[in-house]
């Protein structure tokens, strides 16, 4: 299907212009100059959409990343592609390594092009039903098609124009930026059907161990936080990475001699929900499960285990969520943790289940990923699932909350990773999270933790406040500041914020980076894209 923007007008196929609800590949009629109403859109089903815009120069487009950490922002076709540059191990984690191309502007799930900046007019194309559409954006041509995949020893053949296996349900809309993103979100929510029932759960305020103790946690460090966290007003206390014997060996290590059930009981006795970090879709090569059951993991097409990412000083492997034995193992480990008393699960590195490779069943990689999430939900029917490293589209309706940006950090930016917009930093986390604000009607947004502390941090008080405002805008407040690290003033601030977040704050988006939160107007643009010197207010690592 072809769409053209020329001489200030969209030229749509006839069926779209007459507001047909659905059209199928091979049924597109002649073009017409009629325009769909501003802020509206229609759904179409076809293998490919091409949008040409021969008159436009220096096109600004919306680049949406595949998973939680993937770079997401408005960008220009005149710049190098917005992606993780020249770091293959990092790309395995923060990009779709299979489709990633250093020479091509790409987007996943949706994209938009700004066709008239003076009138705030954009065109948006997005996939529906929880599937990640794939987009390539050039100076004068945008192409949308199914996500590239490979399920056997040869690449998928190029689909014919009416090969139904290559069909994607798309939404196409035009109008002002905010109105079109809102309309697409509404259409996407409707397309999720019965999965929509999991929306709008609120976890409450969260204390997490990660951004202070990282992997150096122990039974003593967690115990020391329980009573102060409860008194401060936190509603969830989450034990992050560092409790397990190893990645894939999900049992408490020697630093937790009493086990985790005792800690979960202490958390509950202090009126909080016990939370835990686990990465159920990955395992290290030396883990018991990989050693005993390598068949549970995704292989390359030569029969070797396929690396799914790099962390903890080595490569790790992705679970084959179509394998019956892998599903049984997945349910067993999660049921065990649930029986310890945990009801809030931070599920990390989920994208590993969607890498290209050979699986037990020949299905698309996103289908296999969703099979894994459904298995998790079967094991944890009433738990709150916060998905990190998650595929955005395929996770919608299957999880409660989702990380929508890279890791934050106790510093503004990392100058050593300037060419990695997925690298840990407050700026990267804020830019990604705000660029995905349109997802808020679909899933609880996790922008990562806010900061109040001055100890162990390079952040100024102004940037601490910015992280707190980011939490307000996204509707979720989490924090990793240890109680003993805080001044009396900072302790009071935590209590006030926890009280404020008894229910999510009321927020209205005014423009791309400007919001009204309660009675306050917050504009993030001067921080993200400063027009004056701000180095006296920030510190970069």
Predicted regions span which residues?
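Aromatic- and carboxylate-enriched substrate-binding clefts and catalytic-loop regions
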Residues: 233-449
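Residue-level signal for short, function-critical loop segments
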Residues: 211-213, 280, 478
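An acidic-aromatic substrate-binding cleft motif
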Residues: 187-236, 240-245
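Alpha-helical scaffolding within the catalytic cores
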Residues: 184-194, 224-225, 258-260, 292, ...
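N-terminal accessory beta-strand-rich subdomains and adjacent acidic, glycine-rich linkers
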Residues: 1-187
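Active-site mouth loops of central-metabolism enzymes
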Residues: 208-220, 314-329, 455-459
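Active-site-proximal substrate-binding groove within the catalytic cores of carbohydrate-active enzymes
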Residues: 161-165, 362-541
């Amino acid at each position: 299907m072809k769409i053209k923007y020329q001489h200030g007008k969209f030229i749509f196929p006839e069926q779209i212009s007459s507001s047909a609800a659905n059209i199928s590949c091979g049924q597109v009629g002649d073009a017409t100059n009629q325009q769909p109403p501003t802020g509206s859109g229609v759904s179409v089903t076809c293998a490919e959409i091409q949008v040409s815009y021969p008159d436009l120069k220096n096109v600004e487009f919306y680049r949406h990343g595949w998973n939680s950490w993937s770079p997401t922002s408005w960008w220009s076709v005149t710049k190098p592609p917005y992606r993780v540059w020249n770091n293959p191990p990092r790309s395995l984690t923060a990009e779709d390594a299979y489709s990633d191309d250093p020479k091509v502007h790409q987007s996943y799930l949706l994209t938009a092009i700004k066709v008239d900046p003076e009138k705030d007019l954009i065109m948006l194309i997005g996939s529906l039903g929880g599937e990640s559409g794939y987009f390539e954006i050039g100076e004068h041509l945008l192409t949308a098609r199914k996500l590239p995949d490979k399920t056997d020893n040869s690449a998928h053949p190029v689909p014919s124009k009416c090969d139904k296996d290559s069909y994607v349900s798309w939404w196409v809309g035009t109008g002002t930026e905010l109105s079109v993103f809102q309309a697409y979100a509404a259409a996407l929510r409707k397309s999720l059907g019965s999965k929509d029932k999991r929306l709008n759960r609120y976890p409450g305020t969260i204390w997490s161990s990660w951004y202070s103790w990282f992997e150096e946690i122990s039974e003593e460090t967690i115990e020391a936080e329980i009573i102060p966290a409860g008194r401060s007003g936190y509603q969830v206390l989450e034990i992050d990475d560092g409790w397990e014997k190893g990645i894939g060996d999900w049992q408490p290590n020697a630093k937790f001699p009493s086990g985790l059930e005792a800690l979960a009981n202490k958390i509950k006795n202090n009126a909080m929900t016990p939370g835990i970090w686990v990465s159920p879709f990955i395992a290290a090569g030396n883990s018991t499960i990989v050693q005993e059951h390598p068949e549970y993991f995704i292989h390359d097409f030569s029969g070797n285990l396929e690396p799914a990412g790099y962390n903890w000083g080595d490569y790790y492997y992705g679970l084959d969520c179509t394998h019956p034995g892998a599903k049984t193992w997945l349910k067993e480990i999660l049921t065990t943790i649930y029986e310890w008393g945990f009801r809030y699960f931070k599920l990390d590195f989920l994208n590993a289940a969607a890498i290209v490779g050979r699986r037990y069943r020949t299905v698309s990689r996103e289908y296999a990923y969703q099979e894994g999430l459904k298995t998790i939900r079967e094991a944890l029917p009433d738990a709150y699932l916060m998905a990190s490293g998650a595929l955005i589209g395929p996770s919608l309706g299957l999880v409660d909350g989702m990380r929508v940006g890279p890791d934050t950090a106790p510093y503004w930016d990392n100058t050593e990773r300037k060419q990695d917009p997925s690298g840990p930093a407050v700026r990267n986390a804020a830019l990604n999270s705000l660029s995905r604000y349109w997802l808020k009607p679909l899933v609880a947004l996790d922008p990562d933790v806010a900061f109040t502390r001055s100890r162990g941090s390079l952040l100024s008080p102004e940037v601490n406040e910015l992280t707190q405002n980011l939490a307000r805008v996204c509707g979720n407040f989490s924090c990793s500041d240890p109680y003993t690290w805080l001044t009396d003033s900072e302790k009071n601030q935590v209590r006030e914020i926890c009280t404020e977040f008894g229910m999510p704050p009321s927020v209205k988006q005014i423009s791309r980076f400007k919001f009204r939160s309660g009675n306050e107007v917050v504009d993030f643009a001067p921080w993200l894209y400063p027009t004056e010197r701000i180095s006296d207010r920030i510190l970069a690592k």
